[in-house]
Design a protein with these regions (language model features):
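Short, structured patches in soluble enzyme cores that scaffold and shape functional sites
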Residues: 65, 164-168
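Acidic/aromatic/glycine-rich contiguous surface patches that form carbohydrate-binding/processing clefts
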Residues: 199-268
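N- or domain-start disorder-to-order transition segments that initiate the globular core
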Residues: 2-15
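Internal, conserved structured core segments that host functional sites
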Residues: 74-165
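N-terminal active-site beta-alpha-beta segment that forms phosphate/nucleotide-binding
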Residues: 14, 21-77
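Gly/Ser/Thr-rich active-site loops/lids in small-molecule metabolic enzymes
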Residues: 180-206
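Short, catalytically relevant binding-site loops at active-site mouths
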Residues: 68-70, 125-128, 169-172
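A short secondary-structure junction signal
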Residues: 121-122, 166-167, 173-179
């Protein structure tokens, strides 16, 4: 709530974002909690619009979307259940497939915003709006969707930033890119199939990736980001009511790779 005990106006959020270091022309990957920001005139749309306004005219906003209905668990099912899914599960459609709910409602708001582009890797799908949206999301590899050639790699190459808008430190999806680059003693490779529409029919294509959900070694993303911030890197502030952190994507990736290899590299 603002100092006047009123919902935040768009201009107030924009001023907070500028004070933190979000600037015109920037490429920003957002992780956000709408609830943490507090009451806002216009709700979630206003939060996104405030970011668009600050980044304009040549900036870009990026978010992780994924696919809420990703059928990556078929190998765990009975043959009968697998056959049922294979015959009837709708294919991945970048235009309509819902964003994963657990990350932020804003991902679905951004996915459906006019002018937004979406990458075509179902599990690692990203949505972006702005001047570099097309270049960030096009030709997303199906295999190793957080690695080389991914939207995350392009975020780093664009000297982009990661904005944690009331979001906890363990939500930094960019660190999956660091995991893919790091030389680690344990890298679990997983295989699954996913339905796509090809020439008017559903085709199940094989996908290979690192297991991003269950690392062998005991570490958390919160540890990595916390260690980075403890060195005085990154910027902290408030946007609305939300404790907010702004991170340099390239610098954080370099730090995270070194942090991981020092503790879990092949020689450790």
């Amino acid at each position: 709530m603002s100092a006047q005990n009123l919902p935040y106006a768009p201009a107030q959020l924009a001023a907070d974002l500028r004070a933190l270091g979000v600037a015109p022309g920037g490429v920003v990957m957002l992780h956000a909690s709408v609830k943490a920001v507090g009451p806002v005139l216009g709700g979630p749309n206003t939060i996104l619009q405030s970011l668009f306004d600050v980044l304009a005219p040549s900036g870009t906003l990026l978010m992780y979307a994924g696919w809420q209905d990703l059928p990556d668990f078929l190998a765990e099912l009975s043959p009968e259940a697998q056959a049922h899914y294979s015959a009837h599960h709708p294919p991945f459609d970048p235009a309509t497939a819902r964003a994963v709910r657990d990350n932020s409602v804003l991902a679905e708001f951004l996915r459906t915003w006019p002018g937004t582009r979406r990458s075509e890797n179902p599990e690692a799908s990203m949505v972006a709006r702005g001047a570099q949206a097309e270049s960030l999301t096009r030709d997303h590899p199906l295999d190793y969707g957080y690695g080389v050639g991914s939207p995350l790699a392009r975020l780093v190459a664009a000297r982009g930033q990661v904005l944690l808008l009331g979001s906890p430190l363990d939500r930094v999806t960019l660190l999956h890119h660091a995991e893919s680059l790091a030389r680690l003693r344990h890298k679990n490779v997983i295989h699954y199939t996913c339905p796509f529409l090809r020439d008017g029919r559903t085709v199940w294509l094989p996908i290979e990736d690192l297991d991003t959900g269950d690392p062998h070694d005991a570490y958390t993303f919160e540890e990595i980001v916390g260690a980075y911030l403890a060195l005085g890197r990154g910027r902290r502030g408030r946007v609305g009511d939300a404790n907010t952190v702004l991170l340099d994507a390239a610098d954080l990736t370099t730090f995270a790779v070194a942090w991981l290899e020092a503790r879990f590299g092949p020689d450790q």
